[in-house]
Structure formats: structure tokens, C-alpha cells
Amino acid sequence: MGPIILSSGGYPVITSTAYERREGTLFAEGVSTVAIADAVGTPAYVYSAGTVRTRYRRLAKAFHGVPHRIHFAMKANANLSILRLLRGLGAGVDIVSGGELFRAREAGFQGSDVVFSGVGKTRREIEDALDAEVALINVESEAELRCIDEVAAARGAIAPVAFRLNPEVTVSTPHAYIRTGEKGNKFGLSREEIGRLLRVLTYLPNVSLRGIGMHLGSQIQDAEALRTALPVLVDAITAARAAGQPIDHMDVGGGLAVPYESGEPEADVEDYAQLVKEAALALGVQVLLEPGRFLVAEAGVLLTRVVYRKESAGTAFVITDAGMSDLIRPSLYDAHHEIEAVQAVERQVVADVVGPICESGDFFAKRREVADVAQGELLAIRTTGAYGYTMASNYNARPRPVEVLVDGDQFAVIAEREQYEDLVRLERTALTWRSA
């Protein structure tokens, strides 16, 4: 597990080495988070560039000795500055929409840096992917494979594809919604379906099968699921080669766990890598990785200010200016995020930490011992660099928060806070009516 420090109240809080206290104040690398909040307001997402670099290099080092490429799953954090940071480290990207393809290109990625995943790619998205000459399109159904062949034929092109295998392996994750490799899941192809598609490929001259991959889910804390699933993937690659397909890579997806609370284990990256490397070397294939959360989650905190304190029917409430529209993970997944006072507070209180949204499900913590902060004080919600801003919304007509990147003793705004005018910018008064 990563380093742990004691909060001002004496309870353990997960941290990357980028977030430490100096004279009682939480710093992001060399910058006071109080100074950041004073400069840009709250709510504010803050990311540590140093943490992203450290995580990427750890993963790359673990896979040293085998041909590999790390494709960042940009659904975790799609800010252009984060993408450019990772591109500079040598990463490619794993995308799941045409919008993400656009963002990847805006961040400077070439088509050859892009792997396109997802179960519901539209015809236009496939057209755009082929026009961009992406490295691979991960196929998840026969209908999709046939659509790719049609689009490629219309362009006189050969589309590079990979099959996404569903190994039908039960995975232990914190929430059912983040399991993707189990039987009956919408993702991927069963072994039987892959066998059938290997025969279908004979009649589809405009697709070229380059690899087979899988993605078991998210927040996988041990290697047992991978140990069970890898032989299924190896068998699928062996069968494809026997059918005459020149498979040159295997994709093991992402899903490496990060700790969200004290005592929660982090994935054993080195053990995970060793299992994959052994299989890859035996097959003579390149390894593709699609980490998202692992690279950016611990890099981020969400700064929020206490608007009011309240007590009702024996329950203490800490009401903040951030809500589920800014960070939906606790409401959607019942996810745990450590919450600490930005400036040292000795007192503790058992309270619900909630937002201003008009929903009972708008909370960050329930009946939890937290710092007994007063109105106007700052809180830091930890491990929010992944699936925070990318899942934010304008619910209750709330502008999305500002994003800030810290690097050493400097910080920069990398996404301006939305303004009220932005909420209606795309809307039009119904003056021109059309007949069906």
C-alpha cells in the first residue's frame, strides 16, 4: 500500500507522497491547497503532475523486458493537460467514443497511439477512427465487425481490429457495476463467439485481426482473477493463430486497484506484471495495457468549502459547496473517499458530509468520523483524480468546477470553472419549426 500519514485528528488518511502537511496545512507538492482555493475558488479539482509521472514509471518498469505499450484509459481523466503529460511520458490512449478521439487528437496523439474500445461504436465513430488511422479497434460483437468491414471497404482500407474476449471470470470488486469480465456482461465476446467470428473473418476482406484482449473490471486488488483468466486468453490467441490469423499482441486491459481508504490494499503491480510477461513471452506477442484509475486517481483531490453546519434528529451535517454533480462516485457506487480538513483541526465529529444538490443521495460520507470543521473552512476529498471531473454534470444547473494542475512549487488552471452563461450557450428558442 502507498504511504500513509496521520491527519490532524490522528486517524490515518491515504495519500500519495505529493500530498503532505506543512505546519498543519495540506500541500499539493510544493503548493498550499489554501493558496489554490483562495486563487481559484471552490469546488476545485487539483492534480499532482509528479504523482502521474511516478505511477506511469512504476507500471512501465514492471513491464520492462517484454514489448509493451501503455494506453491510458482517458475516460478516467480526459483533461488535455493530463493527456499531454502522459503523452510526453510515452503513453498512448484507450478511447471509447468519437469525442474522446477528438480530445486525443487535440492533445497531440497520433492515430497510431489510439486504441478504440467500447460496445456501441456508431458508424460515424468507426468512419472517424479509420480516417484517423487508429492503431486498433476492439470488436465486441459480430454486428460491429461487419460494420467495420463495410466502412473500411467504402474507403478502400483494411481496418486493424482486435477481439475483446469475455473470459467469464468472477472478479471481486467493491461494486458490481465495475465488473466487466463476468458471464452475462454486455462487454466482450465469449470463447464460442470468437470461434464463430474466426470463421466469419474469411468473408470479410477489409478487416485484419491483429490481437485478442480482455478487461476484467476495475479495482482488482489481487492477481487471482488474472491468474484464472490468462489461460483463457492464451487459448483464444492460440486458436486464432491456428485459424491462420497473424496475432501479434494481447491486451490485458486495466483495472489495477488503488486504495481509497486506510487498510485497503493496492494492487501488486509487480506480481500482476510477472504473470502477464510470462504469457506474452511464451506467445511472442506485444502486451497492451489500458490503465486509467491506477495512473491518475491518487494524483487528485477535490477542494470544497463548508457552507453550513446543521444538526437534525441527532445527525450532524457538514454541508459543502461541492455536490454529487461534481463527484458522483459516492452516490453512484457507494464509493469511499477519505475526507480531511485542509487546515489542522483537533476536534472530531461523527457527521454526514453532504452537498447542496436537491437529492437525498447527494453525500460524500455518512455517519463518519471527520474533522469538526466550522463554516467557511476547507475540506479535501481524496483520491479524486479518476472518474471525478469526467463524470461531473450540470445537474441542478450547477457549473462544473475548475481544474488545476500542480507541478513542483507552481500551479496552473487547466480548465476554467464553467459560468452560468455556459449552461445555456447551446440552447435555442424554438422559432424555426420543422415538419417530419
Model-found features: residue ranges?
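Active-site loop/helix belt of alpha/beta enzymes
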Residues: P3-G9, I14, P167-R309, V370, ...
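General structural feature for long, well-ordered alpha-helical segments within catalytic domains
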Residues: S32, I36, S48-T51, R55, ...
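Active-site-proximal loop/turn and secondary-structure-junction residues that shape catalytic pockets
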Residues: M74-A78, G99-E100, G120-K121, S141-A143, ...
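Short acidic, glycine/serine/threonine-rich loops at helix termini
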Residues: I82-L83, E106, I126-D131, I148-V151, ...
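Hydrophobic residues within beta-strands of alpha/beta enzymes
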Residues: V93-D94, V114, I137, I212, ...
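Charged (often Lys/Glu-rich) extended helix/loop segments that serve as interaction or gating elements
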Residues: L275, G284-A436
